[in-house]
Amino acid sequence: MPDQALQQMLDRSCWVCFATDEDDRTAEWVRPCRCRGSTKWVHQACLQRWVDEKQRGNSTARVACPQCNAEYLIVFPKLGPVVYVLDLADRLISKACPFAAAGIMVGSIYWTAVTYGAVTVMQVVGHKEGLDVMERADPLFLLIGLPTIPVMLILGKMIRWEDYVLRLWRKYSNKLQILNSIFPGIGCPVPRIPAEANPLADHVSATRILCGALVFPTIATIVGKLMFSSVNSNLQRTILGGIAFVAIKGAFKVYFKQQQYLRQAHRKILNYPEQEEA
Amino acid sequence: MPDQALQQMLDRSCWVCFATDEDDRTAEWVRPCRCRGSTKWVHQACLQRWVDEKQRGNSTARVACPQCNAEYLIVFPKLGPVVYVLDLADRLISKACPFAAAGIMVGSIYWTAVTYGAVTVMQVVGHKEGLDVMERADPLFLLIGLPTIPVMLILGKMIRWEDYVLRLWRKYSNKLQILNSIFPGIGCPVPRIPAEANPLADHVSATRILCGALVFPTIATIVGKLMFSSVNSNLQRTILGGIAFVAIKGAFKVYFKQQQYLRQAHRKILNYPEQEEA
């Protein structure tokens, strides 16, 4: 070994703890990167701690010398076959579990939809008849058909036919003079066109659609019993109740929105009170 | 009206469209705030549009004069009783729906937990016996008892007894020389204490707990059938299978974590290859 390299070896010092050979003869040294001079040598133990800090618990993270940017060559003892298999299984489970958990959530919502569908069938057609229908039906048809009930209700609820009726109403309102007698002020022109009202915050309108759709069969059954008690068939009575409810609610909604529209249109901004000026 | 005020009225101009009285004799004027001079007067119609813009669809938002900061006095036609009731109902529904939707979600998870509990009872105790037990049980007890099954499984899964065993192992490993023969290298001291490994990302560990807990009864049943087929009682067989599975899995896990620990402890950082230096 040339004298110069030997000399360098003898007066090396660790760039982590600054100790030299005299301070600790037994310590193991390593030159992990391309650096020369005072940052060439470092204790193996000191460097390990330094790398631990840099990795912050992620033992597979790569670490490089902050000065010459050379990546440290970190090697581990070979994995035994058992540990290799366990490691593989561990990583597979970690990868699969988020998807399995998502599957559980979807399964939970699906199962609730099936149950809701079954309850709705019994509610609309009648308890006993509903059970008979479902017992006779093909299980596969049930597992697909029942959850479509809430889906259909939600999609149906998303159809905003009232807004369509409102647009027609405003478009042809001046031709609707005859309606003026029933709904006063229905046909007269508005002094100004108010700004389009903000639609409800997304989450509120989404929850309104969900709740409105899921409670609809119950309301249809109640309205059916109240208004069409003379109709014997549960199904027909509930369907009539549903149609009546949609129509009545729609009429109220159209009227309400039109009144809000008119209210906005007839909004007034007053003069600032005189006396406050003096 | 004093001459000066009259004169001001005559040469007023709208600070939105800059039109004066001559440009539009019929336009309605308003002085909505404390401003004087050229920004005192404005057309009612122009100010309405300006306010619409400021409100961006939120018709109840308050608007103030950008200069004197006086709030505009915006008044609406009085609400009719029907519209008042409809408005009230509309706002109530908007407030209640988010909570109702949250209730539906919780109900969905609860209902899935009840179903999972029932399926697990039938799986562990046996299909027919499970049904008998549940038919004889008090419905209220079922509606509370069944969902606690998945809850108990999840809580049980969160007990990390393997880590406790590991800590004991590392604490008294040097006294465990006798184990050295079974698990080579189990007792010998480690060259360094590796950094604590990062726990799994929260969502991964949460999903692992959820999936591990919910799949446990199925695994316990299978292990029970494989290892304790001589045991007649379904329940006992499944319990034995569960205990065996937990013990075996725990042993593997402790061994695996200890091997990872040792692997980290015997990690080495090599010298940077010489030839690359020249």
Swiss-Prot record, chains A, B:
The chain crosses the membrane at residues 99-119, 139-159, 209-229, 238-258. Autoubiquitinated leading to degradation (short half-life). Keywords: Endoplasmic reticulum, Membrane, Metal-binding, Mitochondrion, Mitochondrion outer membrane, Peroxisome, Transferase, Transmembrane, Transmembrane helix, Ubl conjugation, Ubl conjugation pathway, Zinc, Zinc-finger. Expressed in brain, heart, liver, lung, spleen, stomach, testis, skeletal and muscle. GO terms for cellular component: endoplasmic reticulum; endoplasmic reticulum membrane; membrane; mitochondrial outer membrane; mitochondrion. It is found in: Mitochondrion outer membrane; Endoplasmic reticulum membrane; Peroxisome membrane. Zn(2+) 1 binds at residues 14, 17, 43, 46. Changing residue 65 to S: Loss of E3 ubiquitin ligase activity. Formation of highly interconnected mitochondria and perinuclear accumulation. It holds the Pfam family RINGv. It is an enzyme of class 2 (transferase). GO terms for biological process: negative regulation of cytoplasmic pattern recognition receptor signaling pathway; positive regulation of cGAS/STING signaling pathway; positive regulation of mitochondrial fission; positive regulation of NLRP3 inflammasome complex assembly; protein autoubiquitination; protein K27-linked ubiquitination; protein K48-linked ubiquitination; protein K63-linked ubiquitination. Pathway: Protein modification; protein ubiquitination. Zn(2+) 2 binds at residues 33, 35, 65, 68. It catalyses: S-ubiquitinyl-[E2 ubiquitin-conjugating enzyme]-L-cysteine + [acceptor protein]-L-lysine = [E2 ubiquitin-conjugating enzyme]-L-cysteine + N(6)-ubiquitinyl-[acceptor protein]-L-lysine. GO terms for molecular function: GTPase binding; ubiquitin protein ligase activity; zinc ion binding. Monomer and homodimer. Interacts with MFN1, MFN2, DNM1L and FIS1. Mitochondrial E3 ubiquitin-protein ligase that plays a crucial role in the control of mitochondrial morphology by acting as a positive regulator of mitochondrial fission and as an important regulator of immune response. Plays a crucial role in maintaining mitochondrial homeostasis by regulating the dynamics of mitochondria through the ubiquitination of key proteins involved in fission and fusion such as FIS1, DNM1L and MFN1. Acts as a critical determinant of mitotic apoptosis through both MCL1-dependent and -independent pathways. The RING-CH-type zinc finger domain is required for E3 ligase activity. This is E3 ubiquitin-protein ligase MARCHF5. It comes from Homo sapiens (Human). The lineage of its organism: Eukaryota, Metazoa, Chordata, Craniata, Vertebrata.
